[in-house]
Structures are given as C-alpha cells and as structure tokens.
Amino acid sequence: MFEKLELTRLAQSLAAHSGSRLAVIARNVANADTPGYRASDMRDFRDLLDQPDVALRTTRPGHLASAGPDPAQGLILSGGPMSPNGNDVSLDLQMQKAVEARQSHEMALAIYRSTSAIIRTSLGRNA
C-alpha cells in the first residue's frame, strides 16, 4: 500500500541514497592511508532526482517500477588537498559528510513514519 504513495517512494529512495553514500564514505575512511587513493562521494540526491531518466512512472500493472535513482550513477571524485603519497582523503571532511548522510537518512525515516501514522489514523487504527 505504501509503495503507491509518491512521498513514501521518495523517502525510500532518499534512505537508499543515504545508505549508499555512507558506504562510499566508509570506503574513503578505510583507505585514508592508502597511497594514491582518491576520495569519492555521491552526487546530491536532488541532482539525481532532476535527471530525466529518473522521472519514469508506471502507468500499467505490467510495467516495472523503478526504485529511484541508481546510486552508481552518482559517484564523483571529491577529496581534500593531496598528501605527499597521492592520497586526498580528509578525515574531517569525511566525518562531516557522514553526519550529513545520517541526517538525510533520519529525515527519510521520519517522513516514512509520519506518513504511516497519518494513514493508520485515517483508517482508525491509532496503534
């Protein structure tokens, strides 16, 4: 039932994007001392939504639904200043990005919970 609501699909896509972004950030932190490693990040969720191929809609039951933007399309290089060993991972920057991704994920979950509560209340189920 919830997957038919645009708001919940958007919240699910935001949660998936945030999870993918956290995985990229974790990979950056894990390679902070690897010589020659270049830090990467995900493109902004809003930018991924603005892509024309993401706006596909299912108009008939036989159509396959898209789960949202493809996280692999959003990878970009985004490091800090280059160190002598060719590594550009800034741990401070990665921690800041991790906090942003966590906040986005929490916002997506809050939207999903609020939508669920509204639907339950409208159906007369207060639990």
Question: Where are the regions a protein language model picked out?
Answer:
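Amphipathic alpha-helical polymerization modules
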Residues: 1-127
